[in-house]
Amino acid sequence: MDQQQTKTRGVADIVFLIDVSGSMAPAIDALKANIGTFVESLSKGDANNVSPVRDWRAKAVGYRDFEADTEPFIDNPFVNDVEALRTQLAGLQAEGGDDEPESLLDALFKVANMGQTDKGAQSLDPAKWRYRSDAARVVVVFTDASFKPAMSIPEARGGGIQDVTNAVINNRIILSLFAPDMPGYDELSQIDKSEWEAISYPGLDPQQALVKFTSDQTNFKNTLRQLAASVSKSAETIAL
């Protein structure tokens, strides 16, 4: 194995892309309370994760309806400290976005195209991905809503799911979706290496279902450990 491949293994940039419309407060609280479980499993390993990530950065990004809400996109810098990440999560306020659908495609497009640090740079830009061969890039989505089929951001106005798919693939991003069992998410989950946990319970609407999913502390901790193992596995793969 050459030096570049050895360098790449065990390195990951992770974006938690979270719907911060009004109904999402319980899910955000659950993430804030349990993010330490994710980071510990990611960086130290456990029974599910035998190849922990040795070098990680993460950030929490919020999105709402890009057409209806005054603050539709809440960005943060990449950090490599669990308390700093928890502080970012605490800063995401669940409000607005009362009417579905939300603007997930716009948010994904912006995150995918945030740019990358120059190859061989001596320092990392906290506003950009690492250079593509230096780290796995993972975007973890939490939402309880459907999404608009067309984007409204100026740089991609009128674009749809195929444009987002292209952006995700071209920027070497792996998607992990925690989202309702609704049309559209199956299409996103078909992007290479993507995963979709369809959140659904008999008799519950999507908002109630995500509350139930995240409020079961034992199961949610296990979910985050499994997510950490999945991210670690992605970080084992060489990003070309």
Regions found by a protein language model. Name each.
Residues 1-240:
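Divalent cation-coordinating acidic motifs and surrounding scaffolds
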